[in-house]
Curated annotation (Swiss-Prot):
Cellular localization per UniProt: Cytoplasm, Cytosol
Superkingdom in the source lineage: Eukaryota
Protein name: Cytochrome c lysine N-methyltransferase 1
GO molecular function, one term: [cytochrome c]-lysine N-methyltransferase activity
GO cellular component: cytosol
E.C. designation(s): 2.1.1.59
Organism, scientific name: Eremothecium gossypii (strain ATCC 10895 / CBS 109.51 / FGSC 9923 / NRRL Y-1056) (Yeast)
Gene: CTM1
Catalytic activity: L-lysyl-[cytochrome c] + S-adenosyl-L-methionine = N(6)-methyl-L-lysyl-[cytochrome c] + S-adenosyl-L-homocysteine + H(+)
Amino acid sequence: MRCGWMAGSSETVGIMDTADWYIGHGQVTVAPCVSIERSQIKSPDSGYGVFVDVDKLQEEECEAVELLRVPYGNVISVRTLMDWLSGRGDGYDASKDLIKTYLALFLEDTSNHRFVTETNMLILYLALMAILSERGYGFPDKFVIYLRDVLLQTRLLTPVLEVLTQEAGDAGAHYRNGPQEIFLSTLLQFISGAFMGCTRAVVLRVYAAVLSRCLEIPHETSPGSEDYTVSSSLVPILDFTNHSCEHRNAYFDVDRESGDVLLMLDVAACAGLGDRFEVFISYCPVEELVHFKHTYGFFPRASCGTQFWHMFLSDTWLKEERAPHGSGSLFQIYSELRVLPYIELALISGQVYVNDYCSSFPELLLPFVNIEALSDKESKLTALKGDQQLLAEAKTNFLSFLARYLDKLVANGPIRHSGPVCASLRDILLRELELSKRLRNTLQHGSAFLSSHMADTSPPYCPSPAPSPPYAYMYTSS
């Protein structure tokens, strides 16, 4: 699903007008078989979707059919915005100069350099553009229309937004995104200081909409090269396409000669879908449910493939747990070793397992084995990985801790959720409670480690999560 539904008739007209404008002005090329309508996903957050009418499909014998073509100049990314800012004499010089001035002011504070990622800078660019546009400064229609009718109309609730706008207690604090909270609060402070009377709502909406609508578009590193980098980009019209790893029947690609972004239909994946069907792409190659909630405001539907859940361990409870071979608490040891305490759970066919294939899993085991002769983390990890007896001991001690942790979590779940907690974090905690019950059942009836059930193949790689506020000192980039 694409989060951020457009509620009410005025928003509906606005979105359709936006699509018509981009298509009518040649900003996007659309195949005759394509239409943009309300998604058929049964959810209030499903928004719009891209549909294909098979009767109008002109190249059904091909392996892939081009559904949409968005010219490079109409893709909104840091790269294309910098290209636009570098030009002169198009009637927008005053607006460009102000954008550059405010960008320089933000980056003048060297502590803000840690926020420099493509996505964060895209948020800053577009927040400045939205505010200046409201104050009468001119910008090209392709930017103004997308800002006004898409980004600023997106309604989205995520933990970061709710924490910064509502009362948030300690419940669920270990599932908060520390780096993004720091970035957004810093951005709000900068904007309020730079623009008198600016409302937080504009910045918050731009932040949430950009984060949820960005796609990672590949770009070759040099002409003809097989190597490529990805760029966080907003792709008008193509970004109406909804997400599903399980039902994916299309993908986005780049025309190497023109740089245009393409939505391609995978014809083989459409067999049996009927005469008219909705198009789905994958926003990311793996589904980590906490990340999805933070980014898109929803949990993806259960999949027949592997999904992941990064179970963050409560810093409050870690302070109460003593390490088996030391006097310090688990929280103290993890902090000293700069280990982010989370367990990567693999969700497969309704079962929940501890993913001991995860690259960070050995770090999680360090407090559960006695390696006093070595002081630094890397030496301890090398010793642990190279000694099967040590590894087995660490896993056994870890499982004992995990059993106690799950018992406490299941027993105290309702109490933990009764305090002041925003709706998004409550959703995460309730899902955590459900998965904890299933994991505890797995632990009680056999091995909880994924390697015991998937000995021949390992699951796909899942990127590490961002640290929660108690571990924000570990943050170097978002």
